[in-house]
Amino acid sequence: MSKAAQVKAPWLNSRDPGVPATLTYSELSMCGRVEEMVRRYPDYIAYEFMGKCTTYADMWKKINACAKSLKAIGIREGDKVTICMPNAPQTLCMFYAVNMVGAIANMVHPLSAESEIAFYLRDSGSVAAITLDQFYPKFESVRKAVDLPCLIVTSVADELKPLLKVGYKLTKGRKNPKIPAGRAGVLSWKEFLRRGEYVEIYQVRRKAEDPAAILYSGGTTGVTKGILLSNRNFNALAAQIIATNPFFRPGHKMLAIMPMFHGFGLGVSIHSMVANGGHCILIPRFTPQSYAELIKKHQPNLIAGVPSLFEALLRVKEIEGADLSCLLGVFSGGDSLSVELKKRFDAFLKEHGASITVREGYGTTECVTASCLTPIHKQKEGSIGIPFPDTYYKIVKPGTQEEVPYGEEGEICLTGPTMMLEYVNHPEETAQTKQTHADGLTWVHTGDLGMMDEEGFIYFRQRIKRMIVTNGYNVYPSQLENILDGHEYVHLSCVIGVKDPIKMQRVKAFVVLKPGYVPTEACKQELMDYCRKHIAKYAMPSDIEFREELPKTLVGKVAYRVLEEEENAKLDAKAAENAKIDAQRRQLEEERKAAVQERKAKKAAEAKEAKEAKEAAKEAAKEAETPKE
């Protein structure tokens, strides 16, 4: 009996019909798996960008051209190449070309600050990088401090249709910085491809277990780290995604809005599609209006995104009248989907002709992305679903490997074929996160709080470190957010803990109201009264602050840490102001005391002087009364 067979798996009876408990996984590299699709579906559309479609056969030619050029500039097996790009053809082709030559793709957000880019380049040990012309100044500045032998600079225009290219160069492209010709170590996209024209086709046959990509995440400790993932990790995910969506057919369209530097975007929206004959519609930049228009125009079969993406769609008029009967799968992940938002978006889908509901998933970058998904035919309110085939979950007492009973909260642990190789340059954190349990399996300790019911459905609560402790009670922000989001006034909410000298932390809520509602004291009182009816006294918000919008992370999650930092900054400023006032008070008190002392001293001196004068007068009088001989 295998080790995995000994693990409790109550979810097996909750699988959709046709979804197997175990799968057979490709032993090829990621690129090798894509090559299989090229042979099977050469004339199918692999990706589409700004109205320009590229078949699998043509995509393969582009990947080969990139691979030859990578060889020409000296990239070899095991080298790291940073890809700092939005979703664009160059990003996709370069990613698979890097894989083809046996190198490792280091995926970085193009809006990263200079200091962050420098960190990513140093941390990964990258020997080359590719970015857009509009981000060139950041890299040029960084190159002075970081040893980066080669920088490839491309433009959106490089992959546009001729007319669109002209239009782009006359409008948005005019604002982009010009790349100096002949700059040492800097190549334009055209020059980069020219370098490989006379190089033989170059492909390194890598194994499934070989490293393929580095994705950055806060990890289970909250500190940014590179997560090293293998070919098997990505290929296993692609197989699991298709297995849990048995309706999928080659040629189905995925609107790829999630970025390729994120596990959700790279693993689900891109690789799971091109590794199975899917059609990716590449979206380089998100706005609610353009996203709504793209859905109406392209009629995708699949969309995947974070909750804020779905929340944004509910607010834009551009989606009105859209026929969404084309949708076969809508997936939410990357952040907690509130019960209320799911209800609203499910109703929205139904109103627009879709016969499906949002399926929530859960995952961590330590396992590429999703490892758990709500089944099609059985959903439970508040649940993030059941584990993928060959993936196992258990809930343990935090800080231990001790499994807790069904229905009891603890730390979510998981194991399966998508589990990372390691944290780059962080062996201690790797050992803390990947732990071998008594069952002999290696488990990822996620740092997330959750629960499993008797049917194997998983319920995510929140990050363990996000838990608020007030007066000794544990308060879970996500639960309070679910309650607040259920009020008819509330569009979106975020709950945080604020430092308190007596309670340790107090609860504060931030609320974005729905259109038509005004943030008045009466409105705040209505929400506070609502909270009193639905929230335990110890968990009640001490304050509700209205915002027009909430801060978001680079991938669209609500950035609760930004709100925490803002509140901490206010407290620090208040503490500094109080300290200043206290110092002023102390100074005034010292000055008052000094003045009192001075007055006392002066009075004493005057009294002494008066006494001495009086005594002198007495002596003089006495002397005057004494008869002279």
Where are these regions (language model features)?
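Conserved ATP/PPi-binding loop(s) of AMP-dependent carboxylate-activating enzymes
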Residues: 386-390, 402-435, 475, 570-572
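Conserved adenylate-forming
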Residues: 70-75, 196-210, 214-256, 278, ...
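Conserved AMP-binding/adenylation subdomain of ANL enzymes
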Residues: 235-253, 261-304, 316-317
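ANL superfamily adenylate-forming
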Residues: 12, 141-208
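AMP-dependent adenylate-forming
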Residues: 9-13, 32-55
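Gly/Ser/Thr-rich phosphate-binding loop
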Residues: 300-305, 314-381, 392
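Conserved AMP-binding/adenylate-forming core of the ANL superfamily
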Residues: 43-88, 92-96, 113-118
